[in-house]
């Protein structure tokens, strides 16, 4: 994509409003740190690296406005509990003498990091491969370029012919709405499947690799968008290599993956789709936003430093 998910313009943070895609490309302007919290909570911006950079600018905006930065930092941290990049970014900016300069540095680093991830991962993809990805770990999940989709972009730019399979990623549909859109912008062949079709495609030999992103990597496994575990289990059963692509900032070296908080989102996301109710009245729904892929299901973790073993 030739556009940035996040841009700092004239004292405002301008975000692609991902709730509007793919129907329209609109922007959401954050004029203070409270707008940043709204954007993160309501998935105007999503994806661990993008949330981290957005949070960094949120702290900077609080400092520039003369707000209580400590209070702002804690409120920003509380906006989404599972993505470790959020906490890492806020803590890093808080230690800086100039929060705005540090946020801009992190913005630039994110672009460089994603391209390094792409370079390291591109060699895993062979000419003619069909690659399955879950949710959206592309340019829209970062400042630009992406992690999992960055690997696919890099392989495509290397001249490899490939096909991308995106699952829809219920309940919010990030695969259908965002990943398919990104691949179409690049002219990379892409097909959409329902979430429950992934196992069948692997069983019948239609998938050569799986590459997903991550919201947190810790001892014992990886936390990523709900549904990642089912994809990983099918990949293990049918001997399909399963890779995670993420920056080093997504690593949490202080906790077990099973000790982290898994965000529970509004049940309405499950009960409604496209504004239409899809279940009977008075139906109760459970809506965890993430699940955990154990380390033994992961073939490798693609980072800016190379391909690493799972923790």
Swiss-Prot record:
It is an enzyme of class 5 (isomerase). GO terms for biological process: L-methionine salvage from methylthioadenosine. Gene3D superfamilies: translation initiation factor eif-2b, domain 1, Translation initiation factor eif-2b, domain 2. Its EC number is 5.3.1.23. The active site is at residue 215. GO terms for molecular function: S-methyl-5-thioribose-1-phosphate isomerase activity. It catalyses: 5-(methylsulfanyl)-alpha-D-ribose 1-phosphate = 5-(methylsulfanyl)-D-ribulose 1-phosphate. The keyword Isomerase applies. Substrate binds at residues 46-48, 80, 174, 224-225. The record marks 135 as: Transition state stabilizer. The keyword Transferase does not apply. InterPro entries: IF-2B-related, IF-M1Pi, IF_2B-like_C, Initiation_fac_2B_a/b/d, M1Pi_N, NagB/RpiA_transferase-like. Disulfide bonds: none annotated. Catalyzes the interconversion of methylthioribose-1-phosphate (MTR-1-P) into methylthioribulose-1-phosphate (MTRu-1-P). Belongs to the eIF-2B alpha/beta/delta subunits family. MtnA subfamily. This is Putative methylthioribose-1-phosphate isomerase. It comes from Methanothermobacter thermautotrophicus (strain ATCC 29096 / DSM 1053 / JCM 10044 / NBRC 100330 / Delta H).
């Amino acid at each position: 994509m030739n556009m940035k998910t996040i841009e700092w313009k004239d004292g405002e943070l301008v975000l692609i409003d991902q709730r509007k895609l793919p129907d329209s490309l609109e922007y959401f302007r954050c004029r203070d740190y409270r707008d940043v919290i709204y954007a993160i909570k309501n998935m105007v911006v999503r994806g661990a690296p993008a949330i981290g950079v957005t949070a960094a600018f949120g702290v900077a905006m609080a400092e520039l406005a003369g707000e209580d930065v400590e209070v702002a930092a804690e409120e920003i941290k509380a906006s989404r509990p599972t993505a470790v990049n959020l906490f890492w970014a806020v803590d890093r900016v808080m230690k800086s003498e100039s929060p705005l300069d540090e946020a801009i540095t992190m913005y630039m680093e994110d672009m460089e990091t994603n391209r390094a991830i792409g370079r390291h991962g591109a060699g895993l993809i062979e000419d003619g491969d069909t690659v399955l990805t879950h949710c959206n770990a592309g340019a829209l999940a970062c400042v630009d370029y992406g992690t999992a989709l960055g690997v696919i972009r890099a392989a495509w730019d290397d001249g490899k012919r490939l096909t991308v399979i995106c699952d829809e990623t219920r309940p919010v549909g990030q695969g259908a709405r965002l990943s398919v859109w990104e691949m179409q912008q690049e002219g990379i062949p892409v097909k959409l499947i329902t979430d429950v079709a992934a196992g069948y495609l692997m069983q019948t030999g239609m998938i050569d690799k799986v590459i997903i992103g991550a919201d947190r990597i810790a001892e014992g496994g990886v936390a990523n968008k709900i549904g990642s575990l089912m994809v990983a289990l099918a990949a293990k059963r049918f001997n399909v290599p399963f890779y995670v692509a993420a920056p080093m900032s997504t690593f949490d070296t202080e906790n077990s993956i099973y000790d982290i908080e898994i965000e529970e989102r509004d049940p309405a996301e499950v009960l409604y789709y496209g504004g239409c109710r899809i279940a009977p009245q008075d139906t109760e729904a459970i809506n965890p936003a993430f699940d955990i892929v154990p380390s033994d299901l992961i073939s490798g973790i693609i980072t800016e430093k190379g391909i690493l073993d799972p923790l």
